[in-house]
Regions:
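Beta-lactam-recognizing serine transpeptidase/beta-lactamase-like catalytic domain environment
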Residues: 142-149, 153, 159, 163, ...
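A generic structural motif
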Residues: 110-111, 766-769
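Membrane-proximal periplasmic segments of bacterial cell-envelope enzymes
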Residues: 1-343, 354-358, 362-398, 404, ...
Length: 850
């Protein structure tokens, strides 16, 4: 009924073209190419064709140029910088090392000509590979004459500098750098910031934003010398540049460069200081040149700038070497003609113990935090729990730890800290100004390079002076009613009030010397200091009346019978060691001040007054001391009168570990102290810490329970280690109408153990409050750390359970650094004094000066 339809067979598209053809049988050893293989083959052929074209261009078109460059060999002197000496703590822990890195350099004279594609290729390749930043520079030659300060001030405004002191410092830096540089680098920017500053700089003559590569090339005084573009380049980037070196004329790579590294971190920054790029002013300094006027330093060398790195520069830097080589036109060495190997610097081993230094620094920072929180922030923190530390009032201080037996400096902590690693490759002007204009001055070592009124800690030495001059004895007693009232010479009805710190409680009553030290009575020491003397025009000798602070009433009349300023000066300056440098191996040590009438007349053109003497008697007024001076003099009380020069250096060693020079203990002075006088003062200091009414013994909590101030050094249940000390609170700042002051410095100085002294700890907090409340807890932690070091207390409370890793017994200059071919060892006797090695014969190591 229905016809069937014939189905049309379906052929896949790939088989239709073969329809009707006989199938081709393929052998197993035959290779058949599809379309992809043909494309790949074409790409390979094209690549080889391009390579052949480039090679043809180089060999045929540019062949003569490359042949001439290769044949153009010259002889060149290449200086070799010595390995800088390393620095270790007393246990051999590394404090300053040399880290081996890759560096990229440029020889401006070997760069292709300006304006050529080859020059731009080199420039863009290096900038891209190294990610070089844009920098703001001033060209002094392009600034109109007479407009320098105006332009520089506008640059300061451009950078956002607002404080007058900051701007003045910026102007000073730019002015000095303009004397020695074609271009003065001011700051560097990210890629996002650069366009904004570039646009703003167009309105200022002589000011421009350029890449660091261009700055380094244009600022080079000697184009034939290589200049460091960047140090600490990754190996991958260095290898990439090395592989393309044929296309980068003028660019050199060095895989043996050393960068100074400070593994101990910021806790050692004030002791070590830092190195930084040498500037022309330093190169031209006669102290940094040979007798023939040749500088020890090349243009891109580093030099000690601060701390031990500066003080011991001549020892650490070693002796420069170099080699004469033959180089081709591309700067590649082809033959060594002559070599004078550099001599490495000597290593230094310090008296500092890194564990104790770190513990002292931590205790100091925590103590400042507590001082601010306890005095100012309790109520504020309730409202704002996230209050930042930078809003706190007290922000600076110091801790000094000395061995009383030999003057060894075991710890020298200063706060605030700073990052000395930032200076190694050259700190930016902006960051440097941040440091220098910080009101707490982080770059200043508060322990040795700054001085302050010492407050009642001076009473230790006033007591010794009074006993020595026989103005007081063991039985001397004075009554404190809360203060004294001293009438004017010209008007007995008017006068000045001098209060005791315990004025709110009505004073101390009648005290002898030991009790006056124990309770730190100011009135007692007003009497020790103020002399029996009749001022010119006065009706009678210097006198005072008892003052009752609560009612402002005056009581009985008393005549002074004390030392007077001249005897105070003679004892504090000429017997003890105030008002003069201690000689510690650090630059810029402050000397303090022991004032006298001649000094005041020279400075203020005023005569000396009884009030000046009264203030000096309790460590205030004009008197100034460094925390280091206080520690040195406290050590003399502990050891029986020996004033040691504080010693930071134990020895120097060469790269073989052999001792070259040992720094011996040095006595500055032996103070003749009578045994009975010394016993009285020591007893007073012992009572300060160990008697309930002593200012450093304890404090009552909210429940009226007396709580010890020594929970770390002398915890309950353990054998007590007796400590002797003296608190101090120096009032400073604006004087209020009631005779008190706005701020006060906190001090505490102590030694331990009492019977057989080993250690002195001195604590200072700038504007830190009362010494008994805020300096004593810091000393408690530091003493505990020392006791843990010596085994007198178990480790783990302050120090780690396990000790910090100890370095090699005899570390080498290349410790932690792999250097091919060890440098020649330093001779045991001294450095090579030949002119070739640039050693200054007029300044041997033992005569290093500030």
């Amino acid at each position: 009924m229905f016809r069937s339809r014939k189905r049309i067979p379906y052929d896949p598209p790939g088989q239709r073209k073969n329809k009707g053809k006989k199938p081709e049988w393929k052998r197993s050893d035959q290779i058949f190419l599809n379309r992809r293989v043909f494309v790949m083959k074409g790409a390979i052929v094209a690549g080889f064709a391009a390579l052949a074209t480039r090679l043809g261009y180089m060999q045929i078109v540019r062949g003569d140029y490359y042949q001439a460059e290769t044949a153009n060999t010259t002889q060149s002197w290449r200086p070799e910088t010595p390995v800088r000496g390393l620095i270790f703590d007393r246990q051999g822990r590394p404090l300053a090392e040399n880290r081996r890195v890759w560096e990229v350099r440029v020889v401006p004279a070997r760069l292709p000509k300006r304006g050529t594609p080859e020059r731009e290729r080199v420039r863009s390749t290096v900038i891209s590979a190294l990610r070089l930043p844009e920098v703001l520079v001033i060209d002094p030659s392009a600034v109109p004459e007479g407009s320098e300060e105006t332009v520089h001030r506008r640059v300061a405004n451009l950078l956002g500098l607002t404080k007058k002191e900051t701007i003045d410092e910026f102007l000073r830096i730019v002015r000095i750098r303009s004397l020695y540089n074609y271009l003065v680098e001011v700051d560097q920017f990210s890629d996002d910031q650069a366009p904004m500053f570039r646009a703003a700089a167009q309105e200022l003559p002589g000011v421009k934003v350029i890449n660091r590569f261009d700055y380094l090339v244009e600022n080079t005084a000697v184009p034939d010398l290589s200049v460091v573009i960047k140090r600490d380049v990754s190996r991958e980037i260095a290898m990439t540049l090395e592989a393309n070196r044929l296309y980068l004329p003028g660019i050199e790579l060095n895989d043996t460069a050393l960068v100074r590294s400070y593994p101990a971190g910021e806790v050692m920054s004030h002791v070590l200081g830092y190195v930084g790029p040498v500037i022309e002013e330093e190169r031209q300094d006669p102290q940094n040149q040979t007798a023939g006027g040749q500088s020890y330093y090349e243009f891109d060398d580093t030099i000690g700038k601060l701390g031990l790195e500066l003080w011991m520069e001549k020892v650490l830097r070693g002796n420069r070497g170099g080699k004469f080589v033959e180089v081709d036109g591309l700067g590649i060495e082809t033959r060594l003609i002559y070599e004078n190997p550099p001599v490495p610097g000597r290593n230094l081993k310090l008296t500092i113990d890194l564990e104790l230094q770190a513990a002292a620094t931590a205790a100091l920072e925590e103590g400042l935090f507590f001082s601010n929180e306890d005095r100012y922030l309790k109520d504020q923190k309730k409202a704002d729990p996230e209050l930042e530390r930078h809003e706190y009032r007290a922000g600076a201080g110091a801790v000094v730890v000395l061995d009383v037996r030999n003057g060894d400096v075991l710890a020298l902590a200063s706060y605030p800290l700073y990052d000395n690693q930032l200076f190694v490759e050259g700190i930016s002007t902006r960051k440097y100004l941040e440091y220098t204009q910080d009101e707490n001055r982080p770059l200043i070592n508060k322990a040795a390079a700054d001085h302050f009124p010492p407050g009642s800690t001076l009473k230790i030495f006033m007591a010794m002076a009074g006993l020595h001059e026989d103005v007081i004895n063991a039985n001397s007693a004075y009554t404190c009613t809360s203060g004294i009232w001293v009438p004017y010479t010209w008007d007995e009805t008017r006068g000045d009030r001098y209060l005791c710190w315990l004025r709110e409680e009505g004073g101390h009553g009648t005290l002898d010397l030991v009790s006056a030290l124990e309770r730190s009575c100011d009135v007692f020491f007003y009497n020790v200091g103020t002399p029996e003397q009749k001022p010119e025009g006065a009706l009678m000798n210097l006198h005072y009346r008892d003052l009752f602070y609560a009612t402002d009433q005056k009581g009985d009349l008393h005549f002074f019978e004390g030392l007077g300023i001249q005897k105070m000066h003679d004892n504090l300056h000429d017997r003890f060691w105030f008002g003069q440098a201690t000689g510690i191996e650090l630059p810029f040590e402050a000397v303090g001040l022991v004032p006298d009438p001649e000094w005041k007349n020279d400075i203020y053109e005023e005569g000396w007054s009884a009030g000046d003497t009264i203030n000096t008697s309790i460590g205030q007024g004009f008197f100034l001391a460094t925390p280091l001076q206080m520690a040195v003099n406290t050590a003399a009380i502990a050891n029986g009168g020996q004033i040691h020069r504080p010693r930071l250096l134990l020895e120097t060693v060469d790269d073989k570990g052999a001792t070259i020079q040992t720094f011996a203990t040095e006595s500055l002075r032996q103070v003749k102290l009578q045994r009975d006088h010394l016993d009285l003062v020591r007893e007073g200091m012992w009572r300060v810490v160990n008697v309930e009414t002593g200012t450093a013994h304890g404090a009552y909590d909210d429940d009226g329970v007396l709580v010890s101030k020594w929970p770390y050094a002398n915890p309950p249940g353990e054998e007590q280690i007796e400590i002797a000390g003296k608190t101090g609170t120096a009032e400073v700042g604006v004087k209020r109408e009631d005779g008190t002051y706005q701020d006060s410095h906190a001090w505490f100085t102590a030694y331990a153990p009492y019977a057989e002294p080993e250690i002195v700890v001195t604590v200072f907090l700038k504007e830190g409050g009362e010494g008994s409340s805020y300096a004593v807890p810091i000393a408690d932690k530091v003493l505990r750390a020392y006791f843990e070091l010596t085994g007198a207390r178990a480790r783990g409370t302050i120090l780690r359970q396990d000790e910090l890793p100890i370095g090699k017994e005899h570390p080498a200059p290349s410790a932690g650094v792999v250097i091919a071919g060890s440098p020649t060892a330093v001779p045991d006797e001294s450095f090579d004094q030949s002119e070739d090695n640039f050693v200054d014969e007029e300044n041997p190591i033992d005569e290093i000066e500030e």
